[in-house]
């Protein structure tokens, strides 16, 4: 594996930073996940659901699979209009965490073989190297991880 690929993989799991993105889900109960402890905010369930949608879209791009970005935005926005309780009829919190972890692990595994300098033809902002999508993935996950931590602080379940 290329040294750059290794550094990107390490960044995904929190090497030399505070923690892995997966740490934020530890110990969260189903009821805590659907609660909105902060006025006018999303529940942790809704945030994780959003993270999965976009992580899967980012993975499609990394694998150079065709992506309809307008459709992806439409779906992501429609999903956010559902309430956490409506979403719960589809998946439990534990299933969501498993889905996120599976997709996250796939992104890490792809780093074993992928050329990060290879241009992505499916990227919406021009012909950028695959490395750019990994930066977007890490930034997106980090931002929303912070939102979940904020919810957990408000619930009194953070720090662990």
For each predicted feature, which ranges?
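Acidic-enriched, low-complexity/disordered segments with a strong bias for Aspartate over Glutamate
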Residues: 2, 15, 56, 64, ...
């Amino acid at each position: 594996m290329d040294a750059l690929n290794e550094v990107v993989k390490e960044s995904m799991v929190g090497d030399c930073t505070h923690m892995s993105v997966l740490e934020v889900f530890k110990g969260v109960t189903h009821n805590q996940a659907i609660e909105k402890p902060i006025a006018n905010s999303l529940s942790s369930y809704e945030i994780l659901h959003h993270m999965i949608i976009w992580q899967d879209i980012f993975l499609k791009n990394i694998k150079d699979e065709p992506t309809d970005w307008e459709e992806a935005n439409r779906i992501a926005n429609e999903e956010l209009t559902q309430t956490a309780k409506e979403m719960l009829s589809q998946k439990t919190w534990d299933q969501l965490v498993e889905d996120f972890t599976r997709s996250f692990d796939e992104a890490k595994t792809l780093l074993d073989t992928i050329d990060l300098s290879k241009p992505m033809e499916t990227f919406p902002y021009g012909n950028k190297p695959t490395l750019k999508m990994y930066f977007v993935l890490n930034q997106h996950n980090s931002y929303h991880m912070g939102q979940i931590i904020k919810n957990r602080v408000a619930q009194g379940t953070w720090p662990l």
